[in-house]
Amino acid sequence: MAALVAAAALAAAEPAPAVPQAAGSGGPTSRRDFYWLRSFLAGGIAGCCAKTTVAPLDRVKVLLQAHNRHYKHLGVLSTLRAVPQKEGYLGLYKGNGAMMIRIFPYGAIQFMAFEHYKTFITTKLGVSGHVHRLMAGSMAGMTAVICTYPLDVVRVRLAFQVKGEHTYSGIIHAFKTIYAKEGGFLGFYRGLMPTILGMAPYAGVSFFTFGTLKSVGLSYAPALLGRPSSDNPNVLVLKTHINLLCGGVAGAIAQTISYPFDVTRRRMQLGAVLPEFEKCLTMRETMKYVYGQHGIRRGLYRGLSLNYIRCIPSQAVAFTTYELMKQFFHLN
């Protein structure tokens, strides 16, 4: 999820796609043709690349957040070493297939929703500047989460399994089992409320922080921090290492604010897989249980250091790939 928020934030922070004078294939019409489809592909590719890069860390995060009995006594680095020993190196990528299926529609919905909300907030509500980016980002993130949440539930269930103790044999089997045993469609939306509450500040702060850093950087030091886009020299984009820095700062701040909701969401998503299932039926019960059993640092913020470790490489890949894809698909 973080990777896609970052990718969309990059698009948000930049000016609307410039439309040069007609010149062969680069004219106004060609730049407008299938714009949303090209945006969809750019965001999807960037998200998949970023998520695959940090998939091992995502798997470890799920195991630590939910206190899997095989790994609950270990730290981040110890778990990264223990998973390949117990499950093989592919065990670090368990659940990543479901994530790839989710990440494409997530990116498409988020990007299109962001553009729609941004326009609506600016034209109808008269709000502009960084505030409208904060509002539009929050709304777009929540919209994308609601639409793709069932896939995230399945991914988490698959990631939580360890070798020799499989409840689900694959993505399809997980969908069928959850639907049959956990209340039909409602079973796919366990933990949705803390997810939405966590996504609103996460997406909003990500858009706001990155957009502000980029705007300030390109305004005050364009020659040092920026370069012309390869598909449209009239548009300045951040240099790769500056993208990494700004994205890392935005991701770290947003993650710190929203992390307790992320922990709560994961536990609720796991549902009947956990022995303390009946104590974690609602968001309030889950947060109370985690806090009572493990406290703040080892409970509500358990695994946060892993998220910080994930943040820099994830944002780096997301921003770099998305920049390349935007230029490749003539989106600037």
Swiss-Prot record:
The chain crosses the membrane at residues 37-57, 88-108, 134-154, 191-211, 244-264, 299-319. GO terms for molecular function: secondary active transmembrane transporter activity. GO terms for biological process: coenzyme A biosynthetic process. Solcar repeats lie at residues 34-120, 128-216, 238-328. It comes from the Eukaryota. It comes from Mus musculus (Mouse). The keyword Magnesium does not apply. It is found in: Mitochondrion inner membrane. May be involved in the transport of coenzyme A in the mitochondrial matrix. Very little is known about the physiological function of this carrier. Gene3D superfamilies: Mitochondrial carrier domain (1.50.40.10). GO terms for cellular component: mitochondrial inner membrane; mitochondrion. It is a multi-pass membrane protein. Keywords: Membrane, Mitochondrion, Mitochondrion inner membrane, Repeat, Transmembrane, Transmembrane helix, Transport. InterPro entries: GDC-like, Mit_carrier, Mitochondrial_sb/sol_carrier, Mt_carrier_dom_sf. The keyword Transmembrane helix applies. This is Solute carrier family 25 member 16. Disulfide bonds: none annotated. Belongs to the mitochondrial carrier (TC 2.A.29) family.
